[in-house]
Amino acid sequence: EYGVTLDSVSFNDIVISDTATIGSIVNQIPLGTIIFPNGSNTQIPALPSIISNDTINIDASDYFDFMTLHSGYLSVEIINNFPTDISNIDISLINMIDFSIIANFYFPLISSGSSVIDSISIAGLTIPENVVGILNNLDVNQSSGAVGINYDDALITNFTLSNLGFISASAIFPEQEIYVKKEEQIIDLDPI
């Protein structure tokens, strides 16, 4: 009988991305495609709570069913490719098994063309394969003049699990040698 611990297993960072385009947001605004036509140059007014209580399904089933961790980090990075600043971004990540809050993230301001990242420890947590991100709020700030409207410009949100140390897990581990036992064998080759 041999014991092998999960500490001997290496696991690559898990990155799950979500993209929200200007076009998808403009389509939600009454008369949005008329006020902000694709390819136009126009000033964007302040749009408080343009996104609120929007859900993002974070499906990690390609990587694991569940993980109970003794170490690890959860990071959220938001890349703002909109032509104007965004602010008051409030995100909650919810465990869909017991509906507990895994993490809350708040970003007061993300300038146009920049990105921000925040990270928390998830040591001691059990993370299921299905987590829901709730974008509680996102404000679009007024532009400082006319800006180009390109419906393909997007906010990109990357959720990253890194430096994972497992207590237990049901996961798809990368192919690797976890345990090797070498034994010396003595073979008598003398003829009978």
Q: How should each PLM-predicted stretch be described?
A:
Residues 1-192:
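Extracellular/secretory-pathway and virion-surface proteins
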